[in-house]
Amino acid sequence: MKLQVPRSSLKRSIFHKKRKELLSSLPKIEAKAVARYIRISPRKARAIANTIRGKSVEEAFQILAFSPKKAARIMEKVLKSAVANAENNFGLSVENLYVSECYVNDGPRMKRIWPRGRGRADIIQKRMSHITIVVRDRSKEDEYRKALEELEKKISSEE
């Protein structure tokens, strides 16, 4: 069921404020960690990100521990941070966590000059990455889905 957003700007702003307040009352089931401006090529980091996406946290740690790639060491730190955020900030248990999202975005590029023959020069681009990992609690997903459905019914009935 798609919620109907009011057309007038005043009603729309009130609608979104109410919706935001009500959404904040939902149970927290995910935690996030971001590493920004990491000096590794996004293409190389994405290969590792694709291997751990959808896996349980324990399985993801094992995959990262046995990978010889530089990106695996970085992802391991970010994953540890996401798990710590889930435990400390939201009280989620580690056994039920899984990697729901894991993606790598391009960061800025440092440009360096590489001298070539006959007075020419090539530009070397040293790439950076922004790595984001979101962990989610499997045991609380049904509870969250039910609460969200009730909330949407409540919002649609108020209009």
UniProtKB/Swiss-Prot annotation:
GO terms for molecular function: rRNA binding; structural constituent of ribosome. The keyword rRNA-binding applies. Part of the 50S ribosomal subunit. GO terms for biological process: translation. Belongs to the universal ribosomal protein uL22 family. It comes from the Bacteria. CDD domains: Ribosomal_L22. This is Large ribosomal subunit protein uL22. GO terms for cellular component: cytosolic large ribosomal subunit. InterPro entries: Ribosomal_uL22, Ribosomal_uL22_bac/chlpt-type, Ribosomal_uL22_bac/org-type, Ribosomal_uL22_CS, Ribosomal_uL22_sf. It comes from Thermotoga petrophila (strain ATCC BAA-488 / DSM 13995 / JCM 10881 / RKU-1). This protein binds specifically to 23S rRNA; its binding is stimulated by other ribosomal proteins, e.g. L4, L17, and L20. It is important during the early stages of 50S assembly. It makes multiple contacts with different domains of the 23S rRNA in the assembled 50S subunit and ribosome. The globular domain of the protein is located near the polypeptide exit tunnel on the outside of the subunit, while an extended beta-hairpin is found that lines the wall of the exit tunnel in the center of the 70S ribosome. Signal peptide: none annotated. Keywords: Ribonucleoprotein, Ribosomal protein, RNA-binding, rRNA-binding. It holds the Pfam family Ribosomal_L22. The lineage of its organism: Bacteria, Thermotogati, Thermotogota, Thermotogae, Thermotogales.
